[in-house]
């Protein structure tokens, strides 16, 4: 499975591509950070992110895109920019029929470090170790994008099992409801 991990942001948007093998074997294929000037109009910044993501989707053809879910921050402007960048990425993937999943920062930290409250240095160190990289990925947005892809690779089997369980439960609920109606 090829997973494109995205750490969304207007100033710096981290992009990564990881391929999963058997078990927990992972290979980093590419990583980059899209930068946009803070003084540029919002529409220009979002367009630059969209163009970079479109290029990545065309070049790398991921099976799934994993995006960091925006969480509450004190700076509303930062949250809005992050959400807008994430929306641009999700839309670009959806237009190509690529599955999109969102993961919270604590899910990513827990998957990569075993600690949902790990700091950036711990996440970067574990990403470097897990992927057997020669140097630490910089800036932090690159490491975070890799961590998102790792998280999804390792959580995907559980996500699939949960989806099957929910579908089965819904099917059984409908069957039971139909039997109740027939018995009346």
From Swiss-Prot:
Binding sites annotated in the UniProt record for Mg(2+) 1: 7, 141
Catalytic activity, reaction form: Endonucleolytic cleavage at a junction such as a reciprocal single-stranded crossover between two homologous DNA duplexes (Holliday junction)
Primary localization class, coarse: cytoplasm
InterPro entries: RNaseH-like_sf (IPR012337), RNaseH_sf (IPR036397), X-over_junc_endoDNase_Mg_BS (IPR020563), X-over_junc_endoDNase_RuvC (IPR002176)
Keywords: Cytoplasm, DNA damage, DNA recombination, DNA repair, DNA-binding, Endonuclease, Hydrolase, Magnesium, Metal-binding, Nuclease
GO terms (BP aspect): DNA recombination; DNA repair
Catalytic residues identified in the record: 7, 68, 141
Class in the EC hierarchy, top level: hydrolase
Name under which the protein is recorded: Crossover junction endodeoxyribonuclease RuvC
Gene assigned in the entry: ruvC
């Amino acid at each position: 499975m090829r997973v494109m991990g995205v750490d969304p942001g207007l100033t710096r948007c981290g992009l990564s591509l990881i391929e999963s093998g058997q078990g927990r074997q992972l290979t980093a294929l590419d990583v980059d950070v899209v930068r946009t000037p803070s003084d540029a109009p919002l529409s220009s910044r979002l367009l630059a992110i969209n163009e970079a993501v479109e290029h990545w989707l065309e070049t790398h053809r991921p099976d799934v895109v994993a995006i960091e879910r925006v969480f509450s921050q004190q700076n509303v402007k930062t949250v809005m920019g992050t959400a807008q960048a994430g929306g641009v990425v999700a839309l670009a993937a959806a237009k190509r029929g690529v599955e999109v999943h969102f993961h919270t920062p604590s899910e990513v930290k827990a998957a990569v470090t075993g600690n949902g409250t790990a700091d950036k240095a711990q996440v970067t160190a574990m990403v470097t170790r897990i992927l057997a990289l020669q140097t630490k990925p910089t800036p932090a947005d690159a490491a975070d994008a890799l961590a998102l892809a790792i998280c999804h690779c390792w959580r995907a089997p559980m996500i699939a099992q949960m989806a099957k369980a929910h579908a089965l439960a819904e099917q059984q609920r409908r069957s039971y409801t139909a039997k109740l109606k027939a018995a009346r």
